[in-house]
């Protein structure tokens, strides 16, 4: 549940200007996640969120830009192990089946990992479609993603 909550927090932070923990608690409640301000405070620390200027004279939560590639891959590996149910590929498309409610956050994490050959993702509730280029790299990318499950 914690990882699902973390994904939701990252998705909210990415798409909205959240300036207080109370705002974040409210957005999580609106998403059906029951959480306290104390839990959100711990989540913010664990996720490494920082406050940055929002361009309107205030501040908002954000992920630090200094995340290393190794940090991103480690985090992606944990998310794959927690959420991925099955994977397959055809031509230049890799399809990843996930636990319900986790595909969007995981798709965003794949995009942020900037994996060579991945040109983008499309995610629904429990399915991610990863588009690769060139087509010849698809099996190699698929194997790299499968390695994250181990």
From Swiss-Prot:
**Pathway note:** Amino-acid biosynthesis; L-arginine biosynthesis [regulation]
Q: What's a GO cellular component annotated to this UniProt protein? A: cytoplasm
Q: Which InterPro entries match?
A: Arg_repress (IPR001669), Arg_repress_C (IPR020899), Arg_repress_C_sf (IPR036251), Arg_repress_DNA-bd (IPR020900), WH-like_DNA-bd_sf (IPR036388), WH_DNA-bd_sf (IPR036390)
Pfam families (UniProt xref)? Arg_repressor, Arg_repressor_C
Q: GO molecular-function annotation terms?
A: arginine binding; DNA binding; DNA-binding transcription factor activity
Which processes are annotated in GO (biological process)?
L-arginine biosynthetic process; protein complex oligomerization; regulation of arginine biosynthetic process
Q: Secretion signal: which residues?
A: none
Q: Which UniProt keywords apply?
A: Amino-acid biosynthesis, Arginine biosynthesis, Cytoplasm, DNA-binding, Repressor, Transcription, Transcription regulation
From the Swiss-Prot or TrEMBL record, state where the protein is found. Cytoplasm
Note the superkingdom of the native organism.
Bacteria
Family statement: Belongs to the ArgR family.
| NCBIfam families, per database record | argR_whole
Q: What does this protein do?
A: Regulates arginine biosynthesis genes.
This protein is called what?
A: Arginine repressor
Q: Which gene encodes it?
A: argR
